[in-house]
Curated annotation (Swiss-Prot):
This is Small ribosomal subunit protein uS2c. One of its GO terms (molecular function) is structural constituent of ribosome. It comes from Cuscuta reflexa (Southern Asian dodder). Keywords: Plastid, Ribonucleoprotein, Ribosomal protein. GO terms for biological process: translation. Gene3D superfamilies: Glucose-6-phosphate isomerase like protein, domain 1 (3.40.50.10490), Helix hairpin bin (1.10.287.610). Belongs to the universal ribosomal protein uS2 family. The keyword Iron does not apply. One of its GO terms (cellular component) is plastid. Pfam families: Ribosomal_S2. It is found in: Plastid.
Length: 236
């Protein structure tokens, strides 16, 4: 994997609050190598390590995108949801930002059935199928479609398992992470000081509570994916 320059600026990381970890009482000792200090009861993340692993992750996704690989970005906590959706749309990645449905990957055949149902309902709506339903039935139709849009809207064009999964907030998305491990899908995980860095293929130590920190990390990864896709288009 070729190393590239991704303009990861330490001052910008500080400004985004990437270095702020959790309280010192809420930490995983496995994170000790990534912690630089303690300040006012919280751990301070060593952002030089963050920059190193973020750069490695950018190299990985660039090379994968250049080979036409598919990505899934997962982040369902309230602070991550909007950033995940925005970043995913920009890089044309699949995403889950509301709720991870257990078995979404490990029971792919069931997920595929749900996606087909979702697509059928959307097609029916576009054709004006609602116009021929009773008011009560139309209400139920809309409710079902809205629910599917909420939980499956970000993966509606997914036709198979992703090649790489990017996860924001290891604790919140532990089920998704375990499914990736079970299936052998490579993962890139944003990890705070209460996480286990050994569970992902690439763990990026960073504040997973601040929107600015999440956005900083995702923006770098998305830029690398977009660059890789462009390289794929001009050199297929």
């Amino acid at each position: 994997m070729t190393k590239r320059y991704w303009n990861i600026n330490l001052e910008e990381m500080m400004g985004a609050g990437v270095h702020f970890g959790h309280g010192t009482r809420k930490w995983n000792p496995q994170m000790a190598p990534f912690i630089a200090a303690k300040r006012k009861g919280i751990h301070i993340i060593n952002i030089t390590r963050t920059a190193r692993f973020l750069s490695e992750a950018c190299d990985l996704v660039f090379d994968a995108a250049r080979r036409g690989k598919k990505f899934l970005i997962v982040g369902t906590n309230n602070k991550a949801a909007d950033s995940v959706a925005r970043a995913s749309r920009k890089a044309r990645c699949h995403y889950v930002n509301k709720k991870w449905l257990a078995g979404m990957l490990t029971n792919w055949s069931i997920t595929e059935t749900r996606l087909n149902k979702f697509r059928d309902l959307r097609m029916e709506q576009k054709k004006g199928g609602l116009n021929h339903l009773l008011k009560r039935d139309a209400t139920m139709f809309k409710r079902q479609l809205a629910r599917l849009q909420t939980y499956l809207g970000g993966i509606q064009y997914m036709t198979g398992l992703p090649d790489i999964v990017i996860i924001v907030d290891q604790h919140k998305e532990y089920t998704a992470l375990r499914e990736c491990i079970t299936l052998g899908i490579p993962t890139i995980c944003l990890i705070d000081t209460n996480c286990d860095p050994n569970l992902s293929d690439i763990s990026i130590p960073a504040n997973d509570d601040a929107i600015s920190s999440i956005r900083f990390i995702l923006n770098k990864l998305v830029f690398a994916i977009c660059e890789g896709r462009f390289s794929y288009l001009i050199n297929p």
